């Protein structure tokens, strides 16, 4: 079975793929100090609790936190006797190479989302990922990543507002019933929610103008469903887009062996 690992700035997601479907998906806070042994104990406990008899023989990793990759490699080598495929490393091939400025490093999560998005929806595509940062990835007609946009993430914006303005509380993002808030919490929630609706609409509109094409828009990330309530922002919300991309990239590299 394949162990797919998506390490983001906030959380790290582990999924077990049996060749046809994901048997389980688990999430843990990203911590560069966490050892391979700790990962193994955590994973083994979850596998036991869910009664999944998974014999992991292969692994693929995407990580936006370089310091975490070493211990994830050790986890795979020591406990599963496999060498993980790491997206963004020279040994990892992509179906179509990104077309960006020479010397530019593209986040592996963005490359993975591009591969999955193209596989599921074809080219001329915008992938919006609501993560620690809110990213917009543009996929050309042939499946190549050709650039995009990086904006502060929703929760990051809320935290920054709370940290910079002592009188403002930390609040959770939600869809407010009205744009005009009648208390401080409602005002903040309205500003963030409607502000990000406007951000998505504006950036998508500008990308379409520059591309001279009716780009399809898909969304992923934990907060994507929140911004898909009653609006025509996205053609589709894909909950496990990154994991699907990791499986596709692993399969592609296996075929090249």
UniProtKB/Swiss-Prot annotation:
K(+) binds at residue 129. It catalyses: (R)-pantothenate + ATP = (R)-4'-phosphopantothenate + ADP + H(+). Transmembrane segments: none annotated. Its EC number is 2.7.1.33. The keyword Metal-binding applies. The active site is at residue 109. Substrate binds at residues 107-110, 184. InterPro entries: ATPase_NBD, Type_III_PanK. Gene3D superfamilies: 3.30.420.40. A monovalent cation. Ammonium or potassium. The keyword Kinase applies. Its cofactor is NH4(+); K(+). Pathway: Cofactor biosynthesis; coenzyme A biosynthesis; CoA from (R)-pantothenate: step 1/5. GO terms for cellular component: cytoplasm. GO terms for molecular function: ATP binding; metal ion binding; pantothenate kinase activity. It is found in: Cytoplasm. Keywords: ATP-binding, Coenzyme A biosynthesis, Cytoplasm, Kinase, Metal-binding, Nucleotide-binding, Potassium, Transferase. ATP binds at residues 6-13, 132. Homodimer. Catalyzes the phosphorylation of pantothenate (Pan), the first step in CoA biosynthesis. This is Type III pantothenate kinase.
């Amino acid at each position: 079975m394949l162990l797919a690992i998506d390490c983001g700035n906030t959380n790290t997601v582990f999924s077990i793929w049996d060749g046809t479907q994901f048997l389980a998906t688990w999430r843990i806070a990203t911590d560069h100090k966490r050892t391979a042994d700790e990962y193994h104990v955590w994973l083994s406990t979850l596998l036991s609790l869910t009664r999944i008899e998974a014999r992991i023989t292969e692994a693929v990793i995407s990580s936006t936190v370089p310091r975490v990759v070493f211990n994830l490699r050790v986890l795979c080598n020591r406990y599963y006797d496999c060498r993980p495929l790491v997206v963004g490393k020279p040994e990892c091939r992509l179906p179509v190479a990104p077309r960006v400025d020479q010397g530019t490093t593209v986040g592996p999560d963005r490359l993975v989302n591009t591969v999955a998005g193209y596989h599921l929806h074809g080219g001329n595509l915008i992938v919006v990922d609501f993560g620690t940062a809110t990213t917009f990835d543009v996929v050309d007609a042939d499946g190549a990543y050709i650039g995009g946009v990086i904006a502060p993430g929703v929760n990051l914006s809320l935290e920054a507002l709370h940290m910079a303005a002592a009188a403002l509380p930390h609040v959770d993002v939600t869809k407010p019933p009205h744009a005009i808030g009648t208390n401080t919490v409602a005002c903040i929630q309205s500003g963030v929610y409607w502000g990000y609706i406007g951000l998505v609409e504006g950036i998508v509109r500008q990308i379409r103008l520059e591309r001279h094409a009716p780009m399809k828009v898909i969304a992923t990330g934990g907060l994507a469903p929140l911004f898909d309530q009653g609006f025509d922002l996205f053609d589709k919300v894909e909950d496990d887009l990154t994991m699907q991309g990791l499986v596709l990239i692993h399969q592609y590299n296996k075929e090249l062996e």
